[in-house]
Swiss-Prot record:
UniProt-recorded name of the protein: Protein RecA
Superkingdom of the source species: Bacteria
Keyword Transcription: no
Keywords (A to Z) from UniProt: ATP-binding, Cytoplasm, DNA damage, DNA recombination, DNA repair, DNA-binding, Nucleotide-binding, SOS response
Main location: cytoplasm
One example GO MF annotation: ATP hydrolysis activity
Length: 365
């Protein structure tokens, strides 16, 4: 008897044993408790748009559904604005969003100006960190909410700290709270398909001479459990003469489990208006040579359309038919795998293979 003939009965016995154990696991723990990865119905990670085309591209489509996302950065860098745009995108597509306002600082007028349906936005202003995270867990387990934003981790104050005296030291209480919460809610997030975005603040490590002294609050648990971590910074103040009208923000994808990490996206945030979607479109149109810049002038199909970036954005906003045509052409070029390499997507320069094809991305919101 050949070696192959000897192996065949062993293989059949293994397959039979595997079928028996899989059946036993499903009877004990329910259907879907174990499966072959190729049989999984959710192999492709769906995404929620960030509201900024350049950032969607850097993330591989947007915020992944059913995952934890952390957005951190210094004060006034655009963290809350970024998440309010995500809420607006979810609502635009008929989804339900919730905002857990631990900082008690949500401005409904500003949120409405960014396109948020404030009448239907679920808002909670919890008294303690435990209360906030319990509310988050219950919203996730309902499977009726598509996006939950927690603003912010630094404001999730443990009950022991609130009930104690002002000078009391409750060492590590917030880190323990976050660690327990992440263990509890992560599994539920994956099952429900709800995206949870935690906003976080920066602190400085004491006594650090070499390396980056910055760290985020709430311990290390969130860093491990987050599928995506975004580092957002203000890099420029936008001015017309002496009047400041917005900021230029840079976002580095510090961690990404669903697409290549370390990409960088830049976009404008206008005071009172939020992310400049037309500005993002102009950046990508210029990079894909749909709109050509020569000196201060921008041209489209051989005709000058604006002198300076601001005037070109205004022209595109006023000529919606051409704007929509440019947007379609940009998406088509990205679908073809055209390399995008300039200030807004610097991280793609090092490897053209990193360019994301839009047809490989499934965006649902």
């Amino acid at each position: 008897m050949s070696l192959e003939e000897k192996k065949k009965p062993e293989s059949k016995e293994k397959d039979k044993a595997l079928s028996l154990v899989l059946g036993q696991i499903e009877r004990n723990f329910g259907r879907g408790s174990i499966m072959r990865l190729g049989d999984a119905s959710r192999m492709k990670v769906e995404t929620i748009s960030t509201g900024a085309l350049t950032l969607d591209l850097a993330l591989g489509g947007g915020y992944p559904k059913g995952r934890v996302v952390e957005v951190y950065g210094p004060e006034s860098s655009g963290k809350t604005t970024l998440t309010l745009h995500a809420i607006a995108e979810v609502q635009k597509n008929g989804g339900v969003a919730a905002f857990v306002d631990a900082e008690h600082a949500l401005d409904p007028v500003y949120a409405a100006s960014l396109g948020v349906d404030v009448e239907n936005l679920l808002v909670s202003q919890p008294d303690t960190g435990e209360m906030a995270l319990e509310i988050v867990d219950q919203l996730i387990r309902s499977s009726a909410v598509d996006l939950v934003v927690v603003d912010s981790v630094a404001a999730l104050t443990p009950r022991a700290e609130i009930e104690g005296e002002m000078g009391d030291h409750v060492i590590g209480s917030q880190a323990r709270l976050m660690s327990q919460a992440m263990r509890k809610i992560t599994g539920n997030i994956g099952k429900s398909g709800c995206t949870v975005i935690f906003l976080n603040q920066l602190r400085l490590k004491i006594g650090v001479t070499y390396g980056n002294p910055e760290t985020t609050t709430g311990g290390n648990a969130l860093k491990f459990y987050a599928s995506v971590r975004l580092d957002i910074r203000r890099i420029q103040t936008l001015k017309r003469g002496t009047e400041e009208y917005g900021i230029r923000a840079k976002v580095k994808v510090a961690k990404n489990k669903v697409a290549p990490p370390f990409r960088i996206a830049e976009f404008d945030i206008l005071f009172g208006k939020g992310i400049s979607t037309t500005g993002c479109l102009l950046d990508l149109a210029e990079e894909t040579n749909i709109i050509i810049r020569r000196g201060a002038w921008y041209s489209y199909e051989g005709e000058n359309i604006g002198q300076g970036r601001d005037n070109t954005i205004i022209w595109l906003d006023q000529n919606l038919e051409i704007r929509n045509k440019v947007e379609s052409m940009v998406k088509e070029k990205l679908t073809e795998g055209t390399e995008v390499s300039s200030n807004s997507m610097k991280a793609l320069n090092s490897n053209p293979a990193n360019t994301i094809a839009v047809n490989d991305i499934k965006t649902v919101a």
